[in-house]
């Protein structure tokens, strides 16, 4: 019975290949390579690296926004625009 349950919940190799292909299409470096297939291990490492770089970029943008807001009059039209964008 447990083998039935695990076989129903398992993902087919075709589904895994499709997911890997979709993941590859999301990475900027993979798009430049075109149709070349990277190994799954390399693709996952590139994905982790890309996610880390996105985190750093978000942190940097957050710091820049904080600096910008700190130097602004909180009642100014510019501050109101920024607040509305963040909602």
Curated annotation (Swiss-Prot):
Atypical and probable non DNA-binding bHLH transcription factor that acts as a positive regulator of brassinosteroid (BR) response. Controls lamina inclination by participating in two BR signaling pathways involving BRI1 and RGA1. Involved in the RLI1-dependent modulation of leaf inclination by promoting lamina joint cell elongation, especially in response to phosphate (Pi) availability. Belongs to the bHLH protein family. It comes from the Eukaryota. It is found in: Cytoplasm. Disruption phenotype: Erected leaves, with reduced lamina joint adaxial and abaxial sclerenchyma cell length. The keyword Glycoprotein does not apply. Keywords: Brassinosteroid signaling pathway, Cytoplasm, Growth regulation, Transcription, Transcription regulation. Interacts with LO9-177. The keyword Coiled coil does not apply. Induction: Triggered by the transcription factor RLI1 to regulate leaf inclination in response to phosphate (Pi) availability. Repressed by phosphate (Pi) deficiency in lamina joint cells in a RLI1-dependent manner. By brassinolide (BL, e.g. 24-epibrassinolide). Repressed by abscisic acid (ABA). Residues 1-54 form the bHLH domain. It comes from Oryza sativa subsp. japonica. Its main location: cytoplasm. GO terms for molecular function: protein dimerization activity. This is Transcription factor ILI4.
